[in-house]
Amino acid sequence: MYMLSSDERARLKWACRRGMLELDVIIMPFFEECLDDLPDQEQRDFVSLLTSDDPDLFTWMMGHGRSENPAHAAMVDKIVAHNNSKLR
């Protein structure tokens, strides 16, 4: 499993900060609690997902649409499942 350097982690944490508070609330807990446990490819998928526009991310996270990129769609599913598990 790939371990991020402290600089890489800081840059990625900054990238998790979005222009919409709703996305911060959804994405940051996943970053803080799950990222280190993801396999290398899923970590790369997460980083790639963060390059998406906020309106697209919000639509996908709310379940009102799905990314055409299968890796992004799978990562959104993981993030949403993580957040839903915290509500139980």
Curated annotation (Swiss-Prot):
InterPro entries: SDH, SDH_sf, SdhE_FAD_assembly_factor
Gene3D superfamilies on file: Flavinator of succinate dehydrogenase (1.10.150.250)
Keywords, in A-Z order: Chaperone, Cytoplasm
A UniProt-annotated Pfam family: Sdh5
GO annotation, biological process: succinate metabolic process
Coiled-coil boundaries: none
Chaperone listed as a keyword: yes
Primary subcellular site in the record, as a coarse category: cytoplasm
Compartments reported by the entry: Cytoplasm
Record-level GO cellular component terms: cytoplasm
Claim: Hydrolase is one of the keywords in the record: no
Function: An FAD assembly protein, which accelerates covalent attachment of the cofactor into other proteins. Plays an essential role in the assembly of succinate dehydrogenase (SDH, respiratory complex II), an enzyme complex that is a component of both the tricarboxylic acid cycle and the electron transport chain, and which couples the oxidation of succinate to fumarate with the reduction of ubiquinone (coenzyme Q) to ubiquinol. Required for flavinylation (covalent attachment of FAD) of the flavoprotein subunit SdhA of SDH and other flavinylated proteins as well.
PANTHER family cross-referenced by the UniProt entry: FAD ASSEMBLY FACTOR SDHE
Family statement: Belongs to the SdhE FAD assembly factor family.
Annotated protein name in UniProt: FAD assembly factor SdhE
Organism annotation: Photobacterium profundum (strain SS9)
